[in-house]
Amino acid sequence: MSLGRLCRLLKPALLCGALAAPGLAGTMCASRDDWRCARSMHEFSAKDIDGHMVNLDKYRGFVCIVTNVASQUGKTEVNYTQLVDLHARYAECGLRILAFPCNQFGKQEPGSNEEIKEFAAGYNVKFDMFSKICVNGDDAHPLWKWMKIQPKGKGILGNAIKWNFTKFLIDKNGCVVKRYGPMEEPLVIEKDLPHYF
């Protein structure tokens, strides 16, 4: 039996907290089909820019900024520059940045993962880059589906991601604490960081 099918069968019990083993529900529910019953970002996994699967539980205890990125957007330079700056200044305090390339907005991230990695290296990116994904629609990555429906992850005029460089601030427990629109530059997040370190 597949993990997805098992989670669908057990969903009523999981939602009611009937399983005694803590973490079991989350481990099983962060799949492509059953992301709704996840309780934190730490229950998901994603492929890094080199194609290796990463369990996002590795970010437990860290404050994270999760953002969709694009190489050919008018906001690319300011966002990459400021994200690199934030990472350089706050990584030792426990900040982690997770960048997810996405080609859904104006086809502004057309390159391969290798090309995207090379582009990011031009900005001296030291934060974590992931493989290209969709952030909206049926094919959206489960993490992004989940973040958009969290009480503090909802957007203005609907929950869909509106453009490149939408950012989510995630606390040490893996919960969404704030969403920033694409027009908000990364340094805007700096004022909120001290509340979560």
UniProtKB/Swiss-Prot annotation:
Keyword list, A-Z: Cytoplasm, Developmental protein, Dwarfism, Lipid metabolism, Mitochondrion, Oxidoreductase, Peroxidase, Phosphoprotein, Selenocysteine, Transit peptide
EC number: 1.11.1.12, 1.11.1.9
GO cellular component: cytosol; extracellular exosome; mitochondrion; nuclear envelope; nucleus; protein-containing complex
Tissue expression: Present primarily in testis. Expressed in platelets (at protein level).
Catalyzed reaction equations: a hydroperoxy polyunsaturated fatty acid + 2 glutathione = a hydroxy polyunsaturated fatty acid + glutathione disulfide + H2O; 2 glutathione + H2O2 = glutathione disulfide + 2 H2O; tert-butyl hydroperoxide + 2 glutathione = tert-butanol + glutathione disulfide + H2O; cumene hydroperoxide + 2 glutathione = 2-phenylpropan-2-ol + glutathione disulfide + H2O
Active site (UniProt): U73
Gene Ontology biological process: apoptotic process; arachidonate metabolic process; cerebellum development; chromatin organization; dendrite development; lipoxygenase pathway; long-chain fatty acid biosynthetic process; multicellular organism growth
Family assignment from sequence similarity: Belongs to the glutathione peroxidase family.
Subunit structure: Monomer. Has a tendency to form higher mass oligomers. Interacts with FUNDC1; this interaction promotes GPX4 recruitment into mitochondria through TOM/TIM complex where it is degraded by mitophagy.
Name by which UniProt lists this protein: Phospholipid hydroperoxide glutathione peroxidase GPX4
Organism: Homo sapiens
Gene behind the chain: GPX4
